[in-house]
From Swiss-Prot:
Residues bound to substrate: 315-321
Keywords (A to Z) from UniProt: Cytoplasm, GTP-binding, Ligase, Magnesium, Metal-binding, Nucleotide-binding, Purine biosynthesis
Protein name: Adenylosuccinate synthetase
Entry keyword annotation includes Cell inner membrane: no
Any GO BP: 'de novo' AMP biosynthetic process
Subunit structure: Homodimer.
GO cellular component terms, semicolon-separated: cytoplasm
List of residues binding Mg(2+): 21, 48
Family to which this protein belongs: Belongs to the adenylosuccinate synthetase family.
Subcellular location: Cytoplasm
Keyword Lipoprotein recorded: no
Taxonomic lineage: Bacteria, Pseudomonadati, Pseudomonadota, Betaproteobacteria, Burkholderiales
Family matches, as Pfam families: Adenylsucc_synt
E.C. code: 6.3.4.4
Length: 446
Protein backbone atom coordinates (compact mmCIF):
# COMPACT_ATOMS: atom_id res chain seq x y z
CA UNK A 1 0.00 0.00 0.00
CA UNK A 2 1.35 3.41 -0.94
CA UNK A 3 1.83 6.09 1.72
CA UNK A 4 -0.75 8.88 2.00
CA UNK A 5 -0.02 11.94 -0.09
CA UNK A 6 2.03 14.61 1.61
CA UNK A 7 0.19 17.86 2.28
CA UNK A 8 1.07 20.41 -0.41
CA UNK A 9 -1.18 23.21 0.81
CA UNK A 10 -0.38 25.45 3.77
CA UNK A 11 -2.83 25.53 6.66
CA UNK A 12 -3.37 28.21 9.29
CA UNK A 13 -5.31 27.86 12.55
CA UNK A 14 -6.88 31.05 13.90
CA UNK A 15 -7.70 30.90 17.60
CA UNK A 16 -8.68 33.34 20.31
CA UNK A 17 -6.22 33.76 23.16
CA UNK A 18 -8.65 35.39 25.61
CA UNK A 19 -12.30 34.77 26.59
CA UNK A 20 -13.59 35.00 23.03
CA UNK A 21 -14.76 38.07 21.09
CA UNK A 22 -11.18 38.87 20.02
CA UNK A 23 -12.08 39.75 16.44
CA UNK A 24 -11.32 36.40 14.82
CA UNK A 25 -14.00 36.74 12.14
CA UNK A 26 -12.46 39.79 10.50
CA UNK A 27 -8.98 38.22 10.50
CA UNK A 28 -10.24 34.97 9.01
CA UNK A 29 -12.02 36.97 6.33
CA UNK A 30 -8.82 38.93 5.61
CA UNK A 31 -6.64 35.82 5.43
CA UNK A 32 -9.01 33.87 3.19
CA UNK A 33 -7.65 35.93 0.33
CA UNK A 34 -4.91 33.26 0.48
CA UNK A 35 -7.06 30.23 1.40
CA UNK A 36 -9.33 28.06 -0.67
CA UNK A 37 -11.22 26.58 2.27
CA UNK A 38 -12.27 27.62 5.78
CA UNK A 39 -13.19 25.09 8.47
CA UNK A 40 -15.16 25.36 11.72
CA UNK A 41 -14.00 22.61 14.06
CA UNK A 42 -15.78 23.19 17.40
CA UNK A 43 -18.58 25.02 19.15
CA UNK A 44 -22.01 25.80 17.79
CA UNK A 45 -24.17 28.84 17.13
CA UNK A 46 -23.21 30.30 20.51
CA UNK A 47 -20.26 32.09 18.91
CA UNK A 48 -20.84 35.19 16.81
CA UNK A 49 -18.17 36.34 14.36
CA UNK A 50 -18.75 39.92 13.22
CA UNK A 51 -17.51 41.06 9.81
CA UNK A 52 -17.58 44.59 8.40
CA UNK A 53 -17.12 44.51 4.64
CA UNK A 54 -17.58 47.68 2.65
CA UNK A 55 -19.26 49.25 5.65
CA UNK A 56 -21.88 46.48 5.87
CA UNK A 57 -22.12 44.41 9.07
CA UNK A 58 -22.56 40.64 8.94
CA UNK A 59 -22.73 38.33 11.97
CA UNK A 60 -21.94 34.65 11.39
CA UNK A 61 -22.66 32.08 14.09
CA UNK A 62 -22.20 28.67 12.48
CA UNK A 63 -21.06 29.21 8.92
CA UNK A 64 -17.31 29.85 8.53
CA UNK A 65 -16.31 33.45 7.88
CA UNK A 66 -14.82 32.45 4.53
CA UNK A 67 -18.34 32.40 3.12
CA UNK A 68 -18.01 36.14 2.48
CA UNK A 69 -15.25 35.48 -0.09
CA UNK A 70 -16.43 34.30 -3.50
CA UNK A 71 -15.25 30.84 -4.41
CA UNK A 72 -13.98 29.84 -0.95
CA UNK A 73 -15.24 26.43 0.21
CA UNK A 74 -16.59 26.29 3.77
CA UNK A 75 -16.68 23.26 6.04
CA UNK A 76 -18.40 22.38 9.32
CA UNK A 77 -16.35 19.65 10.98
CA UNK A 78 -17.30 16.75 13.21
CA UNK A 79 -16.28 18.69 16.34
CA UNK A 80 -19.14 21.19 15.90
CA UNK A 81 -22.62 20.71 17.39
CA UNK A 82 -25.20 21.72 14.80
CA UNK A 83 -28.64 23.24 15.15
CA UNK A 84 -30.31 22.76 11.74
CA UNK A 85 -32.82 25.48 12.58
CA UNK A 86 -30.06 27.99 13.32
CA UNK A 87 -28.08 26.88 10.26
CA UNK A 88 -30.96 27.38 7.83
CA UNK A 89 -31.83 30.74 9.34
CA UNK A 90 -28.24 31.86 8.77
CA UNK A 91 -28.18 30.45 5.24
CA UNK A 92 -31.42 32.22 4.35
CA UNK A 93 -30.15 35.54 5.71
CA UNK A 94 -26.94 35.28 3.70
CA UNK A 95 -28.56 34.13 0.48
CA UNK A 96 -31.18 36.88 0.69
CA UNK A 97 -28.22 39.27 0.76
CA UNK A 98 -26.79 37.70 -2.39
CA UNK A 99 -24.19 35.38 -0.80
CA UNK A 100 -24.11 31.87 -2.25
CA UNK A 101 -23.98 29.35 0.59
CA UNK A 102 -25.55 25.95 -0.07
CA UNK A 103 -23.36 25.10 -3.05
CA UNK A 104 -20.20 26.04 -1.08
CA UNK A 105 -20.93 24.63 2.39
CA UNK A 106 -19.96 21.10 3.37
CA UNK A 107 -21.06 19.50 6.66
CA UNK A 108 -19.47 16.43 8.23
CA UNK A 109 -21.79 13.45 8.43
CA UNK A 110 -20.38 12.85 11.93
CA UNK A 111 -21.44 16.26 13.29
CA UNK A 112 -23.65 15.94 16.36
CA UNK A 113 -27.07 17.59 16.32
CA UNK A 114 -28.60 20.05 18.75
CA UNK A 115 -32.20 18.99 19.43
CA UNK A 116 -35.04 20.92 21.11
CA UNK A 117 -34.52 19.11 24.41
CA UNK A 118 -30.92 20.33 24.55
CA UNK A 119 -32.13 23.93 24.39
CA UNK A 120 -34.83 23.31 26.99
CA UNK A 121 -32.36 21.73 29.41
CA UNK A 122 -29.80 24.49 28.89
CA UNK A 123 -32.27 27.25 29.70
CA UNK A 124 -33.91 25.42 32.60
CA UNK A 125 -30.58 24.65 34.24
CA UNK A 126 -29.41 28.25 34.09
CA UNK A 127 -32.71 29.37 35.61
CA UNK A 128 -32.35 26.84 38.41
CA UNK A 129 -28.78 27.93 39.19
CA UNK A 130 -29.91 31.49 39.84
CA UNK A 131 -27.03 33.66 41.03
CA UNK A 132 -24.61 30.75 40.52
CA UNK A 133 -25.32 30.53 36.79
CA UNK A 134 -22.40 29.86 34.45
CA UNK A 135 -23.59 32.32 31.81
CA UNK A 136 -24.40 30.01 28.90
CA UNK A 137 -26.13 31.39 25.83
CA UNK A 138 -29.06 29.01 26.35
CA UNK A 139 -28.73 27.53 22.86
CA UNK A 140 -28.25 23.89 23.85
CA UNK A 141 -24.52 23.69 23.17
CA UNK A 142 -23.49 22.17 26.51
CA UNK A 143 -26.23 19.53 26.70
CA UNK A 144 -25.51 18.50 23.09
CA UNK A 145 -21.84 17.94 23.95
CA UNK A 146 -22.90 16.01 27.06
CA UNK A 147 -24.92 13.63 24.90
CA UNK A 148 -21.99 13.27 22.52
CA UNK A 149 -19.61 12.26 25.31
CA UNK A 150 -22.26 9.97 26.83
CA UNK A 151 -22.55 8.27 23.41
CA UNK A 152 -26.25 8.95 23.11
CA UNK A 153 -25.94 11.92 20.75
CA UNK A 154 -27.65 11.90 17.36
CA UNK A 155 -25.54 12.79 14.33
CA UNK A 156 -26.34 14.45 11.03
CA UNK A 157 -25.99 11.09 9.25
CA UNK A 158 -28.72 9.61 11.47
CA UNK A 159 -31.34 11.90 9.91
CA UNK A 160 -31.14 9.88 6.69
CA UNK A 161 -32.36 6.69 8.43
CA UNK A 162 -35.76 7.75 9.83
CA UNK A 163 -36.51 4.47 11.61
CA UNK A 164 -33.16 4.44 13.38
CA UNK A 165 -33.45 8.14 14.21
CA UNK A 166 -36.93 7.64 15.69
CA UNK A 167 -35.77 4.74 17.84
CA UNK A 168 -32.80 6.65 19.23
CA UNK A 169 -34.84 9.81 19.69
CA UNK A 170 -37.47 8.00 21.77
CA UNK A 171 -34.78 6.61 24.08
CA UNK A 172 -33.15 10.01 24.45
CA UNK A 173 -36.40 11.87 24.96
CA UNK A 174 -37.48 9.47 27.71
CA UNK A 175 -34.25 10.24 29.53
CA UNK A 176 -34.29 13.99 28.98
CA UNK A 177 -37.99 14.39 29.73
CA UNK A 178 -37.40 12.75 33.10
CA UNK A 179 -34.68 15.31 33.86
CA UNK A 180 -36.84 18.18 32.62
CA UNK A 181 -39.99 17.27 34.53
CA UNK A 182 -38.61 15.73 37.72
CA UNK A 183 -35.59 17.93 38.34
CA UNK A 184 -35.87 21.13 36.33
CA UNK A 185 -39.62 21.74 36.68
CA UNK A 186 -40.07 22.04 32.92
CA UNK A 187 -42.85 20.55 30.76
CA UNK A 188 -42.05 17.39 28.81
CA UNK A 189 -41.32 17.65 25.10
CA UNK A 190 -43.53 15.78 22.64
CA UNK A 191 -41.90 12.89 20.78
CA UNK A 192 -43.79 13.15 17.48
CA UNK A 193 -43.42 16.91 17.27
CA UNK A 194 -39.67 16.64 17.89
CA UNK A 195 -39.31 13.80 15.37
CA UNK A 196 -41.24 15.61 12.66
CA UNK A 197 -39.24 18.79 13.16
CA UNK A 198 -35.87 17.08 12.96
CA UNK A 199 -36.70 14.87 9.97
CA UNK A 200 -37.99 17.90 8.10
CA UNK A 201 -34.41 19.17 7.91
CA UNK A 202 -33.01 16.06 6.21
CA UNK A 203 -33.87 16.91 2.62
CA UNK A 204 -32.27 20.33 2.69
CA UNK A 205 -29.21 19.12 4.59
CA UNK A 206 -28.51 16.13 2.34
CA UNK A 207 -26.71 17.91 -0.55
CA UNK A 208 -24.31 19.56 1.91
CA UNK A 209 -23.40 16.45 3.92
CA UNK A 210 -20.10 14.76 3.11
CA UNK A 211 -16.96 13.16 4.50
CA UNK A 212 -15.29 16.44 5.47
CA UNK A 213 -12.11 14.76 6.69
CA UNK A 214 -11.54 13.14 3.30
CA UNK A 215 -12.34 16.35 1.42
CA UNK A 216 -9.85 18.35 3.50
CA UNK A 217 -7.14 15.76 2.90
CA UNK A 218 -7.81 15.83 -0.83
CA UNK A 219 -7.83 19.63 -0.92
CA UNK A 220 -4.45 19.80 0.80
CA UNK A 221 -2.99 17.13 -1.46
CA UNK A 222 -4.10 19.22 -4.44
CA UNK A 223 -2.15 22.19 -3.11
CA UNK A 224 -5.04 24.14 -1.62
CA UNK A 225 -4.53 26.26 1.51
CA UNK A 226 -6.96 25.81 4.39
CA UNK A 227 -7.95 27.98 7.32
CA UNK A 228 -9.21 26.48 10.58
CA UNK A 229 -11.45 28.99 12.33
CA UNK A 230 -11.70 28.68 16.10
CA UNK A 231 -14.72 29.88 18.05
CA UNK A 232 -14.75 31.34 21.57
CA UNK A 233 -11.26 31.60 23.10
CA UNK A 234 -8.56 29.66 24.92
CA UNK A 235 -9.63 30.84 28.37
CA UNK A 236 -13.09 29.37 27.71
CA UNK A 237 -11.68 25.96 26.73
CA UNK A 238 -13.32 23.08 28.60
CA UNK A 239 -9.90 21.78 29.75
CA UNK A 240 -7.65 24.83 29.77
CA UNK A 241 -10.03 27.66 30.60
CA UNK A 242 -11.22 29.12 33.90
CA UNK A 243 -13.21 25.98 34.72
CA UNK A 244 -16.15 25.69 35.39
CA UNK A 245 -16.82 29.11 33.81
CA UNK A 246 -16.03 27.75 30.36
CA UNK A 247 -17.70 26.56 27.19
CA UNK A 248 -18.33 22.88 26.47
CA UNK A 249 -15.71 22.24 23.79
CA UNK A 250 -11.98 22.48 23.26
CA UNK A 251 -11.27 25.91 21.74
CA UNK A 252 -7.51 25.42 21.47
CA UNK A 253 -5.53 24.94 18.28
CA UNK A 254 -4.86 21.26 18.89
CA UNK A 255 -8.56 20.51 18.55
CA UNK A 256 -8.51 21.68 14.94
CA UNK A 257 -7.07 18.26 14.12
CA UNK A 258 -9.63 16.20 16.04
CA UNK A 259 -12.59 18.48 15.29
CA UNK A 260 -12.01 18.51 11.53
CA UNK A 261 -10.45 15.10 11.01
CA UNK A 262 -6.97 16.10 9.89
CA UNK A 263 -3.55 15.09 11.15
CA UNK A 264 -1.79 17.45 13.58
CA UNK A 265 1.09 17.67 11.13
CA UNK A 266 -1.26 19.53 8.77
CA UNK A 267 -1.53 22.48 11.16
CA UNK A 268 1.35 24.61 9.91
CA UNK A 269 0.86 28.03 11.53
CA UNK A 270 -1.09 29.04 14.63
CA UNK A 271 -2.29 32.65 14.65
CA UNK A 272 -3.39 33.81 18.09
CA UNK A 273 -5.86 36.70 18.19
CA UNK A 274 -5.81 39.11 21.13
CA UNK A 275 -7.50 42.41 21.71
CA UNK A 276 -5.40 45.37 22.83
CA UNK A 277 -7.37 45.02 26.06
CA UNK A 278 -9.47 42.21 27.57
CA UNK A 279 -13.18 41.44 27.58
CA UNK A 280 -15.31 38.70 29.03
CA UNK A 281 -19.02 37.85 28.75
CA UNK A 282 -20.87 36.16 31.59
CA UNK A 283 -19.59 34.83 34.88
CA UNK A 284 -16.09 33.86 35.95
CA UNK A 285 -12.86 35.40 37.28
CA UNK A 286 -11.18 38.25 35.39
CA UNK A 287 -7.99 39.52 37.13
CA UNK A 288 -7.51 42.74 35.13
CA UNK A 289 -11.19 43.69 35.12
CA UNK A 290 -12.18 47.36 35.21
CA UNK A 291 -15.85 47.34 34.30
CA UNK A 292 -18.87 45.06 34.71
CA UNK A 293 -22.28 46.53 33.93
CA UNK A 294 -23.87 44.18 36.48
CA UNK A 295 -21.41 44.86 39.32
CA UNK A 296 -21.59 48.27 41.07
CA UNK A 297 -18.06 47.68 42.42
CA UNK A 298 -16.64 47.41 38.89
CA UNK A 299 -17.39 50.77 37.30
CA UNK A 300 -13.93 52.17 36.54
CA UNK A 301 -14.29 55.05 34.04
CA UNK A 302 -11.58 53.64 31.77
CA UNK A 303 -13.37 50.29 31.68
CA UNK A 304 -16.62 52.05 30.81
CA UNK A 305 -14.80 53.92 28.05
CA UNK A 306 -13.34 50.70 26.62
CA UNK A 307 -16.82 49.18 26.55
CA UNK A 308 -18.41 52.17 24.86
CA UNK A 309 -15.68 52.98 22.34
CA UNK A 310 -15.12 49.30 21.57
CA UNK A 311 -18.88 48.64 21.27
CA UNK A 312 -18.47 45.71 23.60
CA UNK A 313 -21.79 43.94 23.39
CA UNK A 314 -22.12 40.24 22.59
CA UNK A 315 -22.86 39.69 18.89
CA UNK A 316 -25.08 36.69 19.70
CA UNK A 317 -26.54 37.53 23.13
CA UNK A 318 -26.34 41.33 23.09
CA UNK A 319 -25.03 41.18 26.65
CA UNK A 320 -22.60 43.91 27.75
CA UNK A 321 -19.06 42.59 27.91
CA UNK A 322 -16.90 43.10 30.96
CA UNK A 323 -13.70 45.00 30.14
CA UNK A 324 -10.18 45.29 31.53
CA UNK A 325 -6.53 45.91 30.72
CA UNK A 326 -4.63 43.52 28.48
CA UNK A 327 -3.48 40.54 30.56
CA UNK A 328 -0.12 39.39 29.20
CA UNK A 329 0.22 36.72 31.90
CA UNK A 330 -3.00 35.09 30.68
CA UNK A 331 -1.82 35.61 27.11
CA UNK A 332 1.38 33.75 27.93
CA UNK A 333 -0.66 30.75 29.12
CA UNK A 334 -2.68 30.77 25.89
CA UNK A 335 0.47 30.96 23.76
CA UNK A 336 1.96 27.93 25.49
CA UNK A 337 -1.20 25.83 25.23
CA UNK A 338 -1.76 26.59 21.56
CA UNK A 339 1.83 26.70 20.34
CA UNK A 340 1.08 30.11 18.84
CA UNK A 341 3.35 31.07 15.95
CA UNK A 342 2.40 34.75 15.82
CA UNK A 343 -0.08 37.19 17.32
CA UNK A 344 -2.68 39.43 15.76
CA UNK A 345 -3.68 42.36 17.95
CA UNK A 346 -7.13 43.77 17.29
CA UNK A 347 -8.93 46.96 18.33
CA UNK A 348 -5.74 48.93 18.90
CA UNK A 349 -7.67 52.05 17.91
CA UNK A 350 -9.93 51.68 20.98
CA UNK A 351 -6.94 52.74 23.12
CA UNK A 352 -6.58 56.03 21.22
CA UNK A 353 -6.74 59.04 23.52
CA UNK A 354 -5.97 57.29 26.80
CA UNK A 355 -3.38 59.21 28.80
CA UNK A 356 -1.89 56.09 30.43
CA UNK A 357 -2.06 52.42 29.50
CA UNK A 358 -1.58 49.47 31.82
CA UNK A 359 -0.37 45.99 30.93
CA UNK A 360 -0.82 43.11 33.38
CA UNK A 361 2.49 41.21 33.41
CA UNK A 362 1.88 38.90 36.38
CA UNK A 363 -0.01 38.45 39.63
CA UNK A 364 0.33 38.24 43.35
CA UNK A 365 -1.30 34.97 44.42
CA UNK A 366 -1.44 34.11 48.11
CA UNK A 367 1.61 36.26 48.80
CA UNK A 368 3.70 34.90 45.92
CA UNK A 369 4.48 36.56 42.60
CA UNK A 370 3.68 34.50 39.49
CA UNK A 371 3.99 35.40 35.81
CA UNK A 372 1.42 33.08 34.21
CA UNK A 373 -2.31 32.52 34.69
CA UNK A 374 -2.85 29.73 37.23
CA UNK A 375 -5.14 26.74 36.77
CA UNK A 376 -8.59 26.75 38.30
CA UNK A 377 -11.09 29.55 38.69
CA UNK A 378 -10.62 29.79 42.46
CA UNK A 379 -6.91 30.54 42.09
CA UNK A 380 -7.56 32.97 39.23
CA UNK A 381 -10.13 34.80 41.35
CA UNK A 382 -7.49 35.36 44.06
CA UNK A 383 -4.95 36.83 41.63
CA UNK A 384 -4.06 40.48 42.13
CA UNK A 385 -2.71 41.96 38.87
CA UNK A 386 0.79 43.42 38.63
CA UNK A 387 0.84 46.25 36.10
CA UNK A 388 3.38 48.05 33.99
CA UNK A 389 2.37 51.53 32.85
CA UNK A 390 2.92 53.14 29.45
CA UNK A 391 2.19 56.60 28.06
CA UNK A 392 -0.76 56.65 25.71
CA UNK A 393 -1.18 58.54 22.44
CA UNK A 394 -3.49 61.32 21.32
CA UNK A 395 -3.38 60.73 17.56
CA UNK A 396 -5.76 58.32 15.87
CA UNK A 397 -4.60 54.86 14.84
CA UNK A 398 -7.95 54.07 13.22
CA UNK A 399 -7.58 52.63 9.74
CA UNK A 400 -3.78 52.77 9.63
CA UNK A 401 -2.13 50.23 7.33
CA UNK A 402 1.60 50.72 7.98
CA UNK A 403 3.69 50.15 11.13
CA UNK A 404 5.64 53.37 10.63
CA UNK A 405 2.40 55.37 10.71
CA UNK A 406 1.72 54.30 14.30
CA UNK A 407 2.59 56.74 17.10
CA UNK A 408 5.92 55.97 18.79
CA UNK A 409 4.15 55.31 22.08
CA UNK A 410 1.87 52.78 20.38
CA UNK A 411 4.90 51.06 18.87
CA UNK A 412 6.56 50.91 22.29
CA UNK A 413 3.44 49.36 23.82
CA UNK A 414 3.24 46.71 21.09
CA UNK A 415 6.94 45.87 21.36
CA UNK A 416 6.57 45.35 25.11
CA UNK A 417 3.63 43.01 24.50
CA UNK A 418 5.87 41.02 22.14
CA UNK A 419 8.61 40.86 24.78
CA UNK A 420 6.30 39.66 27.52
CA UNK A 421 4.49 37.22 25.23
CA UNK A 422 7.71 35.82 23.80
CA UNK A 423 6.45 35.69 20.20
CA UNK A 424 6.13 38.26 17.40
CA UNK A 425 3.08 40.27 16.47
CA UNK A 426 2.24 39.32 12.90
CA UNK A 427 -0.79 41.53 12.31
CA UNK A 428 -2.51 44.56 13.85
CA UNK A 429 -6.15 45.40 13.25
CA UNK A 430 -6.89 49.12 13.35
CA UNK A 431 -10.58 49.03 12.45
CA UNK A 432 -13.47 46.67 11.67
CA UNK A 433 -13.15 46.68 7.88
CA UNK A 434 -11.00 43.98 6.27
CA UNK A 435 -8.62 46.58 4.79
CA UNK A 436 -7.93 48.33 8.11
CA UNK A 437 -5.01 46.05 8.89
CA UNK A 438 -1.25 46.35 9.38
CA UNK A 439 0.59 43.26 8.12
CA UNK A 440 4.02 42.55 9.59
CA UNK A 441 4.37 38.81 8.87
CA UNK A 442 2.03 36.86 6.61
CA UNK A 443 0.87 33.54 8.12
CA UNK A 444 0.59 31.98 4.65
CA UNK A 445 3.96 33.22 3.43
CA UNK A 446 6.43 33.79 6.29
Amino acid sequence: MSAPAVSQGRNVVVIGTQWGDEGKGKIVDWLTDHAQGVVRFQGGHNAGHTLIIGGKKTILRLIPSGIMRDGVACYIGNGVVLSPEALFKEIDELESAGVQVQNRLRISEATNLILPYHVAIDKAREAKRGAAKIGTTGRGIGPAYEDKVARRGLRVQDLFDPAYFAERLRENLDFHNFVLTQYLNHPALDFQQTLDEMLSYAGRLAPMVTDVSAELFAANAAGKNLMFEGAQGTLLDIDHGTYPFVTSSNCVAGNAAAGAGVGPGQLHYILGITKAYCTRVGSGPFPSELYDADNPARQDPIGVRLANVGKEFGSVTGRPRRTGWLDAAALRRAIQINGVSGLCMTKLDVLDGLETLKLCVGYMLDGKQIDILPRGSDAVARCQPIYEEFPGWNTSTFGLKEWDALPQTAQAYLKRVEEVAGIPIAMISTGPDRDETILLRHPYKD
